[in-house]
Structure formats: structure tokens, C-alpha cells
């Protein structure tokens, strides 16, 4: 990416990663355009105004599907995140344990992959986060 121009959404995690200079995989010689409207990023890429965009992979995939365009997505993600579910600190019903058990069962029996498969190609790759937060 050295010498290239990358568009990111303003106030998003990709913007933070590119502007902070803390990720050794990203050369310092990258021009970053912070764009408020995510849809403008795709137009800028399609028109050649930027060399790349950094955004959530699922958003890029959905844009490509909806607009019948093809972009190349890098194999290595810029960032892997997990989602959390919050319960009231004083909740004594054990909902957190129950939910963890149900999610574990859904993962084991393939239900999670089946649900993700309705929305994403290669759904199994989105379940490869066992060590996240470890």
C-alpha cells in the first residue's frame, strides 16, 4: 500500500488503524481519505479516485452483491472483532450461562454456520475466532 490512496469511513476503526500508524503491516506512506458517507467510498474506488478502501468485509460483500460489481478483497483481515452481549450486573437468572450453552450447541450442530450461510458466502470462516480475546 506504500504510495497508494485508501478511503476509510470517518470515525470508524479502519480510520483509526490507518491514521494511528500503529499497525506494522500498513506503510506510513499511505494517503488516507476519511469519508463521512460509506457509499462514497465504493464510488471513489470504482472510479479510480482511490486505490483501495478499508471497511467491514460484510459491508463490501453486500455492496458488491447489490450493485453487481466486483472488488478484490484481501485474504488477511485488517482487524478481527468479536461481538459482546451485555446483561445487568445484578442479573441472577443465569441468562449468560444459558445463552453461552445455546450458542455452543448451535455452533456444534452447524446451526450458526447455516444461519450465516444465508447471508455470507464461506460462512465457516466467520466462525474461526475461537482464540479471540484469549
Which role does the model predict for each range below?
Residues 1-37, 57-59:
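Bilobed "Venus flytrap"/periplasmic-binding protein-like clamshell domains
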Residues 17-21, 44-79:
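A ligand-binding cleft/hinge motif common to bilobed small-molecule-binding domains
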Residues 8-12, 35-39, 54-55, 89-97, ...:
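Soluble non-cytosolic domains of exported or imported proteins
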Residues 1, 44-46, 85, 99:
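Hydrophobic residues within well-ordered alpha-helices
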Residues 27-29, 37-40, 50, 71:
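Exported/periplasmic ABC-transporter solute-binding proteins
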Residues 14-15, 65-119, 122-134:
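Periplasmic-binding protein-like
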Residues 31-43, 79-81:
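Short helix-initiation/N-cap motifs at beta->coil->alpha
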